[in-house]
Amino acid sequence: MGTFNNSIQEKIEKLQKTVDTLLHMGENMDCICVDDLSLLNKEIHEQINDLYPCHGKTAEQEAALCLSLLMGYSVSVYANSEDEVKKRAVLRRSQEIMKKRLPSPLKIQLHTIYDKLLS
């Protein structure tokens, strides 16, 4: 079970990095290949599904987990009704975790994406 918890952080960071890669595609005026875009979206969707059933070991890790999941949902083009239900569940988890004491930057990031997805 210990490796599971250690790997959660790695998975959180990987999802955040993949989302960041997608968001910054084409910044250098490079052409964006549709296949690359499709592959990144597929990776994000798979990573979301892998992380969704997980819970953080600490409040801070739970907040980082919710943040990365919500980041993934915000850019995913594979949204379906099941994903919408999962996203709503993560929003509820986020609402609960934001009531706890968290490092300010993490809380601000989580609150920002939470508000964005609710609007």
Residue map of PLM features:
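Amphipathic alpha-helical repeat scaffolds of TPR domains
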Residues: 5-31, 56-77, 104-119
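Intrinsically disordered, low-complexity regions
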Residues: 9-12, 16, 45-48, 99
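Generic low-complexity, intrinsically disordered sequence content enriched
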Residues: 19, 41-44, 95, 114
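Helix-turn-helix repeat elements of alpha-solenoid scaffolds
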Residues: 33-47, 80-92
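Alpha-helical junction/boundary sensor with strong preference for TPR arrays
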Residues: 47-51, 55, 94-105
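A generic structural signal for ordered secondary structure
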Residues: 87-98, 109, 113
